[in-house]
């Protein structure tokens, strides 16, 4: 039965959607600055295939508690660990979209893989976005990161309008309809400003290169080839190269928000991995 609840996970109350049942658990970890509702195209497909689907809102986003602190990846990974323990999940597959991929990587480093059966990095920010002398392949410069932060501080409505256009576009052309884009803006606006800025800083600066090397469970890297937000060459391609045993699936002509724009292809790749891992 599909249920929604608010659960105390360590220091934060998280809104959790849990389809229940005895199927293998799949935990969906949303991207910035959205909520669990951004998985609307995945939850029914996974449930119909017999999986137990858990989609939660990260602290500070959606319908979860919005504290003034805790927007670093160690804390966010602890929140995820608390959810997994509280729901007593085993053989779970973690699916991290965009910044959610960072939580997957950091969870493995801090909490191990005993309860996991696999992980998925979907349009994920791993291994390390920030370009530096130590990370010349990083797709994000310090100047661009500061520009993004300043834009969000100046006018969040305008920022989210521009962000969702880039999120869903390939070569400037939207890959979703306007109703879908406006719904995504609505999810963005549910975010707390402190949380949005804190997580923006976290995913812009975090380095997951060592975290990824710890992963030994079956792994899928799923990414759009036309991602303008988290370019494939500086993220998905490197994540796949770092995790030697990982499976790579590149969605053709797909933007960052590929789980919505290319939902059928995304779901086919995800279900194929879940059934084979």
Which stretches of residues belong to each language-model region?
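Conserved alpha/beta-hydrolase "nucleophile elbow" surrounding the catalytic nucleophile
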Residues: 32, 92, 96-98
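Conserved acidic catalytic loop of the alpha/beta-hydrolase fold
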Residues: 75-92
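Flexible "cap/lid" loop of the alpha/beta hydrolase fold
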Residues: 105-110, 114-154
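Conserved alpha/beta-hydrolase "acid-adjacent" motif
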Residues: 228-234
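Catalytic histidine-centered segment of alpha/beta-hydrolase-like enzymes
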Residues: 254-267
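Conserved HGGG/HGGXW glycine-rich cap/lid loop of the alpha/beta-hydrolase fold
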Residues: 15-69
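Short beta-strand/loop motif that positions the catalytic acidic residue
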Residues: 215, 221-223, 227
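Conserved alpha/beta-hydrolase catalytic His-Asp/Glu region
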Residues: 130-139, 150-213
């Amino acid at each position: 039965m599909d249920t929604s609840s608010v659960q105390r996970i360590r220091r934060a109350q998280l809104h959790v959607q849990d389809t229940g049942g005895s199927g293998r658990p799949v935990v969906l970890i949303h991207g910035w600055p959205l909520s669990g509702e951004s998985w609307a195209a995945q939850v029914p497909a996974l449930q119909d295939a017999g999986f137990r689907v858990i989609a939660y809102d990260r602290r500070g986003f959606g319908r979860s508690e919005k504290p003034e602190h805790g927007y670093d990846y160690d804390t966010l990974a602890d929140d995820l660990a608390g959810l997994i323990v509280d729901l007593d999940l085993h053989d779970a597959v973690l699916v991290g979209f965009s910044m959610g991929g960072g939580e997957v990587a950091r969870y493995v480093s801090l909490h191990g893989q005993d309860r996991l059966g696999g992980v998925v990095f979907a349009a994920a920010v791993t291994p390390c976005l920030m370009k530096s002398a130590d990370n010349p392949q990083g797709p994000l410069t310090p100047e661009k990161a500061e520009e993004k932060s300043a834009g969000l501080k100046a006018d969040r409505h305008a920022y989210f309008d521009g962000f969702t256009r880039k999120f869903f576009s390939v070569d400037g052309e939207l890959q979703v309809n306007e109703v879908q884009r406006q719904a995504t803006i609505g999810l963005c606006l549910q975010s707390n400003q402190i949380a949005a800025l804190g997580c923006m800083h976290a995913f812009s600066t975090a380095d997951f290169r060592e975290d990824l090397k710890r992963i030994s469970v079956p792994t899928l890297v799923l990414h759009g080839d036309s991602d303008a937000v988290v370019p494939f060459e500086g993220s998905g391609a490197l994540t796949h190269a770092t995790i030697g045993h990982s499976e790579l699936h590149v969605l053709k002509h797909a933007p960052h928000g590929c789980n919505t724009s290319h939902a059928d292809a995304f779901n086919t790749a995800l279900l194929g991995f879940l059934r084979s891992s």
